[in-house]
């Protein structure tokens, strides 16, 4: 045997030994050799690899640290979004979650009377670590990529850094792992590791961290992986993303498989059945919280069976099959030193408490939110008071109550300034209006608002920061500090001014040179052709988030239609209630906002919207005359009465013109309902408004003659469809809306009268029942083909 062959054999032996010791130490918590012996074996391997560099491989335990610092983190697009979890703060929240799960699985669970308690769901339970969510991608058992969660859709490539975490296997153990396996989990720092890190920083005069979570996040995002390697980071897996191959069919089974492959999981993982067992687990972990080696802020419950998870699906930003049950926030006493007022993007002037610094759950708190002046009044708060401070969710400090017995004699009342603390404009008090069922009522609350609009630098800065953000116009490199410079120097007085910035103006900014100037101007130029959805979100319409912006763009197709849509028309969009509809309508009706939009769309310097088109077919098909009458909120006219009126008269004009005798001939329409309807349409303003709404609905492609004719004219009229399993191209709710737009009735269970079942991956008893009854079954491709045939947009 040659020297090289002998070295190769010894290197392979050392790597196997070290990997085994790492697995026993970090995963099984059963160290088999002293640390000194581990270090000796590690140094021997390093020496051999230095002497025989041709035998060095990337998965060697010595290769956790990269040699050259990175200049920046690359972007990683998550194939399957890394969604956040919904939260439970009270026991009732947990019970409501369990009820929703059981309702969603009604036809899959045994036990008869479901909500009577006959069936209980199995849940996996584990502590919610207070760290940073990351994704580890393994291909053929080798770690090939690490990424942060980011915004859920896009994260940062931190491969070099996660390789330095000692309990992250560079190569999976055992066998049976999928060819491609994305492991998701939390990078965190133990309490002991955090204390040691800070102690070392104090000794060397370095920076200390406020808490383990900040330390973990800061360590993981170092461009130099050598720094990350010097920090005591750990990883704990809690789930999976993309997979090419097979995994066990339960959450607990998958995590136990991870453990067998060398991937660390929580030692507190448990499998329980029912909501009470979840509560018992929560109480047990809560009692032992301070004794755990790491910080946690709650526990996580997940439906155990993967098929059930698929059946339940997702909401817009969170799964329906999992919830984080947060612990009560930590509270401390401190003194209110003063109150300052800050101005937000919409001009709202809100109070911020300035506190005598106090440690709350490991963080020094000197400021706290007071939300608004109604909250100040509710608390009876005065400057000089001793107050109870809570970090809600262990993150956001709040003033919870006043300790009245400690109030000093010179405590001062808190008053809203008459003029904006930033621009000096008047501060106006606006009474809040509550809208419900077409009626307005004055709310007890009020909002104080600076009237300066974009002439107020605080509002201008926040408006531009929102406008350029990743989910809006996505102008890379235009951070908060640069926005502040642009506004402070008078270079930008509205978002439209970004598109007229010159090279000379940007070059003069602090921190800019030739390359950075060109990069920023290029990024601004690249943002000139946004999608309609991005542009709507970028405008900063109150209560319009990213999902609502997408819905508006997808349904109405153009900025012109959105801008002139009446609030009653907007409520035909799913999940757009009266409050949001009026916010949208009022925003576009405002002359100042119209001017800003006109400047942004200036033909020479402004943006050119992409993806403008027609009204979506499913939106045009979603209106009915009965539904329209119901939305008018006429007293004593409920949905049943509206259907009878639509069937009897067939048109809005016919209903408006109906006299008392005509109305009394409507079968089983109560006399008081008939009188209420006649009184309503005797008011000219009501007639004018109803006709205006109908005219706009017709302009947007909606038509009706009678409820029966509207349905009979649709291709799937009279058919009952059922959706089951997971759909990839769209959510089941969207598919349901599209089918209903074609005239189908979408039911929750299969019967002999069912026309067709659409079955995606994970379909269970509904698919089996369809096959048993001989009901037609389509897969997702078949459903999409059907939509294409009938001109329904995907």
UniProtKB/Swiss-Prot annotation:
Residues at which NAD(+) binds: 35-39, 84-85, 126, 149, 186, 302, 326
Major enzyme class: ligase
Enzyme Commission number(s): 6.5.1.2
GO biological process per UniProt: DNA repair; DNA replication
Keyword line: DNA damage, DNA repair, DNA replication, Ligase, Magnesium, Manganese, Metal-binding, NAD, Zinc
SMART domains: BRCT, LIGANc
Domain BRCT: residue ranges: 711-794
Statement: the UniProt record of this protein carries the keyword Magnesium: yes
GO molecular function list: DNA ligase (NAD+) activity; metal ion binding
Keyword RNA-binding: no
Needed co-factor(s): Mg(2+); Mn(2+)
Active-site annotation: 128
Catalytic activity: NAD(+) + (deoxyribonucleotide)n-3'-hydroxyl + 5'-phospho-(deoxyribonucleotide)m = (deoxyribonucleotide)n+m + AMP + beta-nicotinamide D-nucleotide
Family: Belongs to the NAD-dependent DNA ligase family. LigA subfamily.
Function statement: DNA ligase that catalyzes the formation of phosphodiester linkages between 5'-phosphoryl and 3'-hydroxyl groups in double-stranded DNA using NAD as a coenzyme and as the energy source for the reaction. It is essential for DNA replication and repair of damaged DNA.
Protein name from the UniProt record: DNA ligase
